[in-house]
Amino acid sequence: MLIALKNIFAELSGGEAARSAISEQHQLRMAVAGLLHEMMRVDSKRGVEETQTAIAGMVGMFGLPDAEAKALLDEAGSQRLTSYFDPASTIKRLLSLEQRTILVENLWRVAFADAELDVYEDQFVRKIADLLYVPNTECMLARQRARGEG
Protein backbone atom coordinates (compact mmCIF):
# COMPACT_ATOMS: atom_id res chain seq x y z
CA MET A 1 0.00 0.00 0.00
CA LEU A 2 2.78 2.40 0.96
CA ILE A 3 4.68 1.56 -2.21
CA ALA A 4 1.55 2.19 -4.29
CA LEU A 5 1.15 5.63 -2.69
CA LYS A 6 4.81 6.41 -3.35
CA ASN A 7 4.37 5.42 -6.99
CA ILE A 8 1.29 7.64 -7.32
CA PHE A 9 3.15 10.62 -5.84
CA ALA A 10 6.15 9.93 -8.07
CA GLU A 11 3.90 9.85 -11.14
CA LEU A 12 2.19 13.07 -10.09
CA SER A 13 5.45 14.89 -9.47
CA GLY A 14 6.86 13.51 -12.75
CA GLY A 15 3.80 14.79 -14.57
CA GLU A 16 4.25 18.16 -12.89
CA ALA A 17 7.89 18.26 -14.02
CA ALA A 18 6.84 17.47 -17.59
CA ARG A 19 4.19 20.21 -17.50
CA SER A 20 6.77 22.61 -16.09
CA ALA A 21 9.21 21.77 -18.90
CA ILE A 22 6.48 22.32 -21.50
CA SER A 23 5.52 25.61 -19.89
CA GLU A 24 9.17 26.69 -19.81
CA GLN A 25 9.56 25.81 -23.48
CA HIS A 26 6.44 27.84 -24.33
CA GLN A 27 7.78 30.80 -22.31
CA LEU A 28 11.04 30.60 -24.23
CA ARG A 29 9.28 30.45 -27.59
CA MET A 30 7.06 33.39 -26.64
CA ALA A 31 10.07 35.40 -25.45
CA VAL A 32 11.90 34.81 -28.74
CA ALA A 33 8.73 35.49 -30.77
CA GLY A 34 8.17 38.69 -28.80
CA LEU A 35 11.64 40.00 -29.59
CA LEU A 36 11.36 39.03 -33.26
CA HIS A 37 7.97 40.74 -33.46
CA GLU A 38 9.35 43.88 -31.82
CA MET A 39 12.18 43.83 -34.36
CA MET A 40 9.58 43.92 -37.15
CA ARG A 41 7.89 46.93 -35.53
CA VAL A 42 10.98 49.03 -34.79
CA ASP A 43 11.19 50.83 -38.13
CA SER A 44 7.39 51.21 -38.47
CA LYS A 45 7.57 49.49 -41.89
CA ARG A 46 6.44 45.92 -41.40
CA GLY A 47 6.77 44.11 -44.69
CA VAL A 48 6.15 40.59 -45.88
CA GLU A 49 9.92 39.99 -46.07
CA GLU A 50 10.35 40.78 -42.37
CA THR A 51 7.48 38.49 -41.39
CA GLN A 52 8.83 35.62 -43.50
CA THR A 53 12.32 36.12 -42.07
CA ALA A 54 10.99 36.12 -38.50
CA ILE A 55 9.03 32.92 -39.19
CA ALA A 56 12.17 31.34 -40.68
CA GLY A 57 14.08 32.35 -37.53
CA MET A 58 11.52 30.63 -35.29
CA VAL A 59 11.53 27.54 -37.51
CA GLY A 60 15.33 27.43 -37.46
CA MET A 61 15.66 27.88 -33.72
CA PHE A 62 12.91 25.54 -32.58
CA GLY A 63 12.19 23.24 -35.53
CA LEU A 64 8.56 24.35 -35.64
CA PRO A 65 6.24 24.10 -38.63
CA ASP A 66 5.73 27.44 -40.38
CA ALA A 67 2.10 27.69 -39.23
CA GLU A 68 3.02 27.23 -35.56
CA ALA A 69 5.85 29.77 -35.84
CA LYS A 70 3.46 32.27 -37.43
CA ALA A 71 0.88 31.63 -34.70
CA LEU A 72 3.49 32.30 -32.00
CA LEU A 73 4.54 35.54 -33.70
CA ASP A 74 0.90 36.60 -34.00
CA GLU A 75 0.30 35.79 -30.33
CA ALA A 76 3.42 37.72 -29.37
CA GLY A 77 2.22 40.63 -31.47
CA SER A 78 -1.07 40.78 -29.59
CA GLN A 79 0.82 41.11 -26.30
CA ARG A 80 2.68 44.42 -26.34
CA LEU A 81 6.05 44.24 -24.60
CA THR A 82 6.45 46.91 -21.95
CA SER A 83 9.97 45.85 -21.09
CA TYR A 84 12.65 43.82 -22.82
CA PHE A 85 14.03 42.61 -19.50
CA ASP A 86 11.50 39.81 -18.95
CA PRO A 87 11.94 38.05 -22.30
CA ALA A 88 15.70 38.62 -22.14
CA SER A 89 15.96 37.06 -18.68
CA THR A 90 13.92 34.03 -19.81
CA ILE A 91 16.15 33.62 -22.86
CA LYS A 92 19.37 34.04 -20.84
CA ARG A 93 18.21 31.42 -18.37
CA LEU A 94 17.22 28.82 -20.96
CA LEU A 95 19.61 29.29 -23.90
CA SER A 96 23.37 28.90 -24.21
CA LEU A 97 25.56 31.73 -25.47
CA GLU A 98 25.71 30.05 -28.88
CA GLN A 99 21.90 29.86 -29.07
CA ARG A 100 21.56 33.48 -27.92
CA THR A 101 24.02 34.50 -30.64
CA ILE A 102 21.86 32.69 -33.20
CA LEU A 103 18.87 34.68 -31.93
CA VAL A 104 20.84 37.93 -32.36
CA GLU A 105 21.72 36.82 -35.90
CA ASN A 106 18.02 36.20 -36.57
CA LEU A 107 17.23 39.70 -35.29
CA TRP A 108 19.81 41.10 -37.73
CA ARG A 109 18.25 39.02 -40.53
CA VAL A 110 14.85 40.59 -39.82
CA ALA A 111 16.47 44.04 -39.76
CA PHE A 112 18.09 43.43 -43.17
CA ALA A 113 15.02 41.70 -44.67
CA ASP A 114 13.73 44.89 -46.28
CA ALA A 115 17.23 45.66 -47.66
CA GLU A 116 17.42 48.78 -45.52
CA LEU A 117 18.92 48.96 -42.02
CA ASP A 118 17.19 51.66 -40.03
CA VAL A 119 19.13 53.35 -37.22
CA TYR A 120 16.44 52.23 -34.75
CA GLU A 121 16.78 48.64 -35.90
CA ASP A 122 20.53 48.79 -35.35
CA GLN A 123 20.04 50.24 -31.88
CA PHE A 124 17.39 47.65 -31.00
CA VAL A 125 19.55 44.66 -31.93
CA ARG A 126 22.53 46.04 -30.02
CA LYS A 127 20.35 46.68 -26.95
CA ILE A 128 18.91 43.16 -27.03
CA ALA A 129 22.36 41.62 -27.56
CA ASP A 130 23.56 43.53 -24.51
CA LEU A 131 20.60 42.31 -22.43
CA LEU A 132 21.31 38.73 -23.57
CA TYR A 133 24.99 39.06 -22.61
CA VAL A 134 26.10 38.43 -26.17
CA PRO A 135 29.55 40.04 -26.51
CA ASN A 136 29.82 42.91 -28.99
CA THR A 137 32.27 40.98 -31.18
CA GLU A 138 29.75 38.11 -31.48
CA CYS A 139 26.99 40.62 -32.21
CA MET A 140 29.00 42.16 -35.05
CA LEU A 141 29.96 38.74 -36.45
CA ALA A 142 26.27 37.79 -36.37
CA ARG A 143 25.50 41.02 -38.22
CA GLN A 144 28.02 40.13 -40.95
CA ARG A 145 26.60 36.61 -41.29
CA ALA A 146 23.05 37.96 -41.51
CA ARG A 147 24.14 40.40 -44.17
CA GLY A 148 25.84 37.63 -46.12
CA GLU A 149 29.37 38.93 -45.53
CA GLY A 150 30.64 36.27 -43.17
Predicted segment positions?
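Small-residue-enriched hydrophobic alpha-helices in membranes
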Residues: M1-E38, V42-G150
